[in-house]
Structures are given as structure tokens and as C-alpha cells.
Design a protein with these regions (language model features):
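GST superfamily/GST-like fold recognition
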Residues: 105-109, 130
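Acidic, low-complexity terminal tails and accessory targeting/binding regions
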Residues: 25, 36-48, 91, 95-97, ...
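Short beta-strand scaffold positions
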Residues: 6-7, 80, 102-103
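Phosphate-coordination/substrate-recognition cap region in phosphate-metabolizing enzymes
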Residues: 1-58
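Generic beta-sheet signal
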Residues: 2, 97-103
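Generic structural signal for well-ordered alpha-helical scaffold segments
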Residues: 79, 83-91, 112
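Short glycine/proline- and acidic residue-enriched helix-loop micro-motifs
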Residues: 56-77
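Active-site signature of alpha/beta-hydrolase-fold catalytic machinery across serine-
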Residues: 18, 110-114
């Protein structure tokens, strides 16, 4: 890689440090890569959540919608944050750059949707340290005259790949 970014959260930044130690590249913290804020559920196991917030737990369990959880980051805000992260990474780099970013399993769904240019979130069990590898033409990303259906400009090389753990 030519550039390394990481969520500033401890576990992720430590993973980034370990994974890139041999390259000795600086790791740039990028706040927009942090995990989603689950509000009052933070730091609690499911039994504690159910005991302390039974109605919010029931609504979340039925809908899987974090907007029912007090103080949780709203879904719309997560989408905006993910789009901001993708747009920043694209705007700050050229096609010659190779970017490595370390993030979390919750926000990655929003990052993936933003990168794919879709409004729908796809459920995907993301493995710890799973790799997602994309090639994209950053210089033509925001141009309206770019052929969006041109498969050599945007390519998925790896998606949720944990084979390095085998």
C-alpha cells in the first residue's frame, strides 16, 4: 500500500499497527471509519440489555433497527459518515495510490453500500480481519460522463475474504 488508514478505536488501530509493521508506513486515523455507536447498549451483553432496556431490546430484536435504541447513532448518520469516508479516500488519492483501510464489521456495511452507490444495505456476516479489495478509477469517480457500466473502472477483487486465517 501507499497509504494506510484506520479507525482510531483501540482494537482496530492495534490491528492496523500489527498488520503493517513490516512496511513501516504511518497509519492515518480516520474518524469516519469508527464502529457504529450502539447507544445505551454499549458495553453490555444481551442479558444486561434485556434487563435494563426491555422495550428497546424487544424493538431492536424484532426490527434489527438501531434507531429504536436510545442514544444510538441514527442509521441516516451512519450512511452520511460512510459516504464521507469513501469520498475523502477517493478525493485524497490518485489511481496510482494503493489504500489500505482498517475498520469495523458494523460500519463496513454502510461503507460497502456507499462504495457500490446503492441505498440498500446487504446483510453479510463479516469475519474478523476479513479483507475487501476494490480497484476503482478515482479520477473518474465523480464525473457524470464516466461509463458507470464499464467493468474495468470499478472492480471487486475480494469480498469478505478471511482465507488468510486458514
Amino acid at each position: 500500500p501507499t497509504h494506510v488508514y484506520s479507525s482510531p478505536m483501540i482494537r482496530t488501530s492495534e490491528t492496523a499497527r500489527i498488520a503493517t509493521a513490516a512496511w513501516n508506513y504511518p497509519i492515518t486515523p480516520l474518524y469516519d471509519l469508527i464502529e457504529i455507536d450502539v447507544g445505551v447498549f454499549s458495553g453490555k451483553n444481551w442479558e444486561e440489555v434485556q434487563a435494563q432496556y426491555p422495550e428497546a431490546a424487544r424493538l431492536y430484536h424484532e426490527t434489527r433497527n438501531w434507531d429504536h435504541v436510545p442514544e444510538a447513532e441514527p442509521m441516516a448518520d451512519r450512511r452520511v459518515r460512510a459516504e464521507r469516508a469513501i469520498n475523502q479516500l477517493i478525493a485524497d488519492h490518485t489511481n496510482e495510490d494503493k489504500i489500505l483501510a482498517f475498520t469495523h464489521g458494523g460500519i463496513i456495511h454502510y461503507l460497502f453500500a456507499a462504495l457500490m452507490g446503492v441505498d440498500r444495505l446487504w446483510g453479510m456476516p463479516v469475519g474478523n480481519t476479513a479483507m475487501f479489495d476494490f480497484d476503482l478509477d478515482v479520477e473518474r469517480w465523480h464525473h457524470n460522463d464516466s461509463p458507470l457500466l464499464h467493468t474495468t473502472l470499478w472492480r471487486i477483487n475480494r469480498l469478505n475474504d478471511s482465507s488468510h486465517l486458514d
